Amino acid sequence: VKYNRVNKKVEINGLNISKCSNEAVALLLLGIAHENGLKISKDNTFSFLAAIADMNQYSPVCDFLEEAQKAYNGKQDYIRDMWANFELDPESGQDPDFCFFLFKLWLISAVRMAFNKGAESAQGVLVLVGAQGIGKTRFLYMLLPFKEWGAEGVSIDPQVKDDVIKSTGFWIVELGEFGE
């Protein structure tokens, strides 16, 4: 039993429960306990499951980033390579060096948030502007080795609990359309 800090779900090795809520997982365990003659209350099942999962927290994103750091040869500039995929509007008057600096800060912030235990909040949002079909969403998934680490078209109203839960269950999210 372990707790995935990215998707905020309890996981049990050997059981495919990826689509289940934490409450459903606890009820499943309660049923297994009762089938095997164990007398345990629903409340205790929830408490024990939460305690065990809390002691076994992990982040697949952090694991991936740590492995990527070990594999990095120190020579290739992957950030600059990614930046080369973007085009700034020449009529906007934007300073390309400053925009690249902000892009790097955003990437660093994404990595910091992966390792964050809740003490910090992200500073800044990467905003990609352009016509449909030019690759803005594709860029999101280019960053992510596993599609389930990201979400697209998310809308966030901080007053709506479900919006907050949905948006925080991923490493990187693409927010829905912005107005001009």
What positions do the PLM features span?
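Generic detector of intrinsically disordered, low-complexity, polar/charged segments
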Residues: 11, 28, 34, 130, ...
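Conserved AAA+/SF3 P-loop NTPase catalytic/coupling segment centered on the Walker-B
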Residues: 170-180
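P-loop NTPase catalytic core of nucleic-acid-dependent motor ATPases
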Residues: 53-172
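N-terminal nucleic-acid engagement/recognition segments and initiation subdomains in replication
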Residues: 1-77, 81, 94-101
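Residue-level preference for alpha-helix termini and adjacent loops
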Residues: 2-5, 9-14, 85, 113, ...
